[in-house]
Amino acid sequence: MFNKVERLSPNISGKQKKKKQIILTNTGRDVEEYLTSLKYRMNGKFKRVPHYIVTKDGNVIQTLPDETYSNYFTEPNINRNSIIVSFENLGWLEKVPLKDYYTNWIGNIYKGSAYEKKWRDYFLWEPYTEIQMQS
């Protein structure tokens, strides 16, 4: 399913040339909390808005028109030349000692199985859902 939502950031630039790359990220929290944070952080002037969000149940939400960009990264050329797709996912996880769950960088609890893959200093990740991968 594909949904468009109201423009979440006034900090987008006008029309640009064709995009050259797609960058995949994660939301770091559930989609409702993420959308709320985008809409209300810094009085609606939050600059890091992806073009699309893919929810755990496979819905795709468009938050910005493809031909525009937000200041998602600190490098302007990356922003202007990229489509940013953010997957609903907690991202990297830490195992809570003596507990049967994990937490992410903002303290969200995850009780499923973690995917083990070293990247920088992180080793455990919330897996993406199969339907997200198909979206």
Question: Predicted regions: what is each one?
Answer:
Residues 2-135:
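Active-site-adjacent loop/helix surface patches within enzyme catalytic domains
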